[in-house]
Amino acid sequence: MTDATFGFDSAFLHRLERLSLLNRRPLQGPSAGPRRSPRHGASVEFADFRTYVTGDDFRRVDWNAYARLDRLFLRLYRAEEITVVTIFLDHSTSMQFGDPKKSFIAGKLAAILSYIALHNYDTVAIAGWGDGIDRFLPGQSGKKAVPRVWRTIAQLVDNPVPATNVANLKTYGKYRRGPGIAVVLSDFMTDSDWRSGLRSLRAVGQEVTAIQILAPEEIDPPLRGDWKLVDAETSAGAEVTISPRLLHRYREALERHTKAITEFCRREGIAFAQLRTDVDLNGTVLSDLRAAGILA
């Protein structure tokens, strides 16, 4: 059973609190301009303090607090337009592959992104999906919501469903419409029309991020000789002799598939990143997501 704390310690969570999800679509009104965090808004509703870090706007330093405590603090204000972040977690059976499993890494990443969003006063919704959206946790707000959000993620990781159909992300429109950020976590190992699924999220006002999660054994299979391979989602099997030539053809096919996703996302204005299950989620992955324009 997946630990609903995902093994994160307080030092790592403190690092996450210095990040925000990057919304590439400018907000309208007083919060207009590229958004780093909705609590850096221009409304007059006071929200909280936090410690000053290099690069913060000196105009929001609370000098009274500095005079009392000899430390720099920023006054934070609740933005007038709160961003809704929906994390779509693929919990199909193909995500059970790998050591650690792809589903476990996707769950930890969902926990990381949800924590960052909730810390920044965003609203977070969780959509579990396989053949379609089979579980939906409506928008949760504030850090008090972290345990509930993480429990939902852990339950999805522990309860796989038979198939992946990215095209059925179009059913999200039944749950909500309007501006927001949609983060799709999947291996994208599907014959379904993933293009129409991602486009459908854009059509209902979402700024879309797609993160493909693959196991090293999928990228470079350590197989030779005679095997019976079974499709994780359809249970269809095939007996094959795995030769260097066949492995070469497989790698070429996977590269074409990943290239198609990458180029599609670039054309559609969708942020895209590929992560391996052996990634250091407590370290380099945060830098990778910043480089991909997903975190700021």
Regions from the PLM with identified roles:
Residues 48:
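Acidic, metal-associated active-site segment
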Residues 58-60:
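N-terminal juxtadomain amphipathic helix
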Residues 1-38, 51-56, 65, 70, ...:
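Exposed, interaction-prone extracellular/peripheral surfaces
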Residues 39-43:
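A positional/architectural concept
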